[in-house]
């Protein structure tokens, strides 16, 4: 298989200390003389030879379907009796803490916030005011000191214990999002000039991406908190992890039909007539991301297939894949296996290309 990962552009968003206004503001507010330990990183990638659903799947997984970390407050951690500023409610402060971008590798660290305003002015509480109270000594900070957590009126206090690191995925809570601002476009579909798009209310492409079958794509995204000394290493790890997550989820589907001769509640196979076979596969806790990827890749591998579609059932937390084809049960399973293997091969190749492209 040819190289899928054609090009990558990695750009950290650094503070422009050459600008006197920015330099003075950074020094006055945060006593900064150098770059912050964590920086947002924009990544632009070009892919070739894969379908639209593959890029969409990678985009969705990188954004909100891959495990990541956030800061949260344990029940009882917000000390109401010791926090005297009525404007700083638990929910207000919790949301601010949740959405501090962090770079964490485990869940062993615990922080606290113990702030008292002894001045005559309103005091702004920043993430730098969080103190570590448990866990191993940090070699590098896991968050920047510049995020606003709350505000204290003169003479008031805010006490929070047990601020811990929580693991989850972005589709359950947006604070877990690994990447943000994900977007992709197709480079092999002719587009309208910018001036025409403005007054003709056009989408941009002269042909629908749903019918033109684009094979050359550009995916852009931003990782909001990457350690400055290890930008390439971290970006490479994130991209490879996304490929492995997709491979793992596809392999879970593979396990359902491996022994299809034995009765399995997740797999239903029956003959509709003498020629057609219908397969219904139920996949637990799966999303449109994998459904769309499977549907597209099965159509590509079996162009004359009668039907392939999927339905996500949120209240059951499952996805149901339906396939109808002019084949025996054994032949249908064989064709499905080839489609699954093709998806796995694509993401294994992509993972290898990432290693080659990002040093």
UniProtKB/Swiss-Prot annotation:
Stated role: Component of the DNA-directed RNA polymerase (RNAP) that catalyzes the transcription in the cytoplasm of viral DNA into RNA using the four ribonucleoside triphosphates as substrates.
Keyword Lipid biosynthesis on entry: no
Stored Pfam families: RNA_pol_L_2
Keyword Metal-binding belongs to the record: no
GO molecular function: protein dimerization activity
Lineage, uppermost ranks: Viruses, Varidnaviria, Bamfordvirae, Nucleocytoviricota, Pokkesviricetes
Family according to the record: In the N-terminal section; belongs to the archaeal RpoD/eukaryotic RPB3 RNA polymerase subunit family. In the C-terminal section; belongs to the archaeal RpoL/eukaryotic RPB11/RPC19 RNA polymerase subunit family.
Disulfide-bond pairs as recorded: none
A cellular component annotation (GO) from this entry: virion component
SUPFAM superfamilies named among the record's database cross-references: Insert subdomain of RNA polymerase alpha subunit (SSF56553), RBP11-like subunits of RNA polymerase (SSF55257)
Compartments (UniProt record): Host cytoplasm; Virion
Assembly: Part of the viral DNA-directed RNA polymerase that consists of 8 polII-like subunits (RPB1, RPB2, RPB3, RPB5, RPB6, RPB7, RPB9, RPB10), a capping enzyme and a termination factor.
Entry-linked InterPro entries: RBP11-like (IPR036603), RBP11-like_dimer (IPR009025), RNApol_insert_sf (IPR036643)
Name of the featured protein: DNA-directed RNA polymerase RPB3-11 homolog
Domain of life per record: Viruses
Up-regulation conditions: Expressed in the early phase of the viral replicative cycle.
GO biological process, one term: DNA-templated transcription
Keyword field: DNA-directed RNA polymerase, Early protein, Host cytoplasm, Transcription, Viral transcription, Virion
């Amino acid at each position: 298989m040819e190289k899928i990962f054609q090009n990558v552009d990695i750009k950290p968003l650094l503070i422009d200390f050459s600008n006197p206004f920015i330099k003075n503001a950074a020094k006055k507010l945060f006593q900064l003389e150098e770059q912050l330990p964590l920086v947002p990183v924009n990544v632009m990638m070009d892919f070739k030879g894969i379908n639209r659903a593959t890029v969409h799947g990678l985009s969705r997984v990188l954004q909100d379907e891959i495990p990541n970390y956030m800061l949260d407050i344990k029940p009882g951690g917000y000390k109401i009796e010791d926090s005297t500023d009525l404007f700083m409610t638990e929910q207000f402060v919790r949301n601010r803490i949740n959405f501090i971008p962090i770079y964490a590798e485990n869940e062993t660290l615990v922080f606290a916030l113990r702030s008292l305003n002894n001045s005559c002015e309103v005091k702004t509480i920043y993430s730098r005011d969080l103190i570590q109270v448990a866990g191993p000594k940090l070699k590098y900070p896991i968050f920047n000191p510049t995020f606003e957590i709350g505000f204290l009126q003169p003479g008031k206090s805010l006490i929070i214990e047990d601020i811990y690191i929580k693991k989850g995925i972005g589709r359950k809570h947006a604070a877990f999002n690994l990447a943000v601002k994900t977007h992709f476009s197709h480079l092999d579909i002719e587009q309208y000039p910018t001036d025409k798009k403005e007054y003709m209310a056009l989408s941009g492409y002269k042909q629908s991406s749903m019918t033109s079958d684009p094979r050359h794509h550009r995916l852009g995204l931003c990782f909001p908190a990457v350690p400055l000394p290890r930008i390439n290493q971290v970006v490479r790890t994130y991209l490879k992890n996304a490929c492995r997550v997709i491979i793992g989820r596809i392999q879970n589907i593979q396990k359902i039909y491996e022994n299809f001769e034995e009765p399995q509640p997740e797999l239903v196979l029956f003959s509709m007539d003498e020629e057609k076979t219908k397969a219904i596969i139920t996949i637990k806790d799966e999303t449109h991301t994998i459904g769309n990827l499977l549907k597209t890749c099965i159509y590509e591998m079996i162009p004359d297939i009668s039907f392939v579609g999927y339905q996500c059932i949120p209240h059951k937390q499952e996805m149901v894949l339906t396939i109808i084809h002019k084949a025996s049960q054994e032949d249908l399973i064989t064709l499905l296996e080839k489609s699954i293997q093709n998806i796995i091969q694509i993401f294994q190749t992509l993972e290898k290309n990432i290693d080659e492209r990002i040093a």
